[in-house]
Amino acid sequence: GQRNNLEIINIFTEAGKINENAPKHYVGLDRSEARKQILKELKDKEFFEKEENIKNKVPYGDRSNSIIEPFLTEQWFADAGKLSVKAKEVVNSKKTNFFPENWSKTYFQWMNNIEPWCISRQLWWGHQIPAWYGPDNKIFVAYNEDEAKQLANKHYGKDVELNRDPDVLDTWFSSGLWPFATLGWPDDKKFVEKFYPTSVLVTGFDIIFFWVARMIMFGTEFLNKEPFKDIYVHALVR
């Protein structure tokens, strides 16, 4: 679809039923029933060419054992490419070192091919995204609700009701803040100034990108300083 510049249209509700973007006689049908109806209509109108069995990998939920259906939704993304610039520089300049050194190749393999990072998750635990929506869905990103209300009041010229985004941050986003958030940042910088950066991080090779890279990205972005000098990478017990 994107190769042919087609519009991206979501036809499902969150319950897996057909929404109003589809022809009216399909709206409200379960996705499996809609497939049957569409197939019948193609045959009735003599647009159907052939039917054959094919092998396909169909994803199932590990708890529900239900088929996982691709579903288009709006999400929050971080510009990881921009965040990676300083993070690559501190390793290139040996301000931060990997031991064994060969693990830096894994680090750069990820960082040199980095893509926009989807940071929002539809879960019921985690740091809630600090964004509020006005009556016309205008977004106000703020430190807290009071600050969001002030921004909204200035924008609309009156008090309005705001609704907070229900999504939470990706757990690796929260984990990436760990080196300085645990020290009281951003409200209290006393311990940050005393204990940041630290000297050594010991971790497994499986989370070099998921955790190590994110800590370096956030440390260099928010504090302009790498969070640790040496990274000792160990194997895993499987």
What is the predicted role of each segment?
Residues 2-11, 50-238:
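Structured secondary-structure scaffolds
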Residues 17-33:
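A short-motif feature that recognizes glycine-rich, charge-decorated loops
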Residues 16-17, 215:
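Surface-exposed, flexible loop/turn segments at secondary-structure boundaries
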Residues 30-58:
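Phosphate/diphosphate-binding loops
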Residues 16, 38, 61:
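Active-site cavity-forming subdomains of large catalytic enzyme subunits
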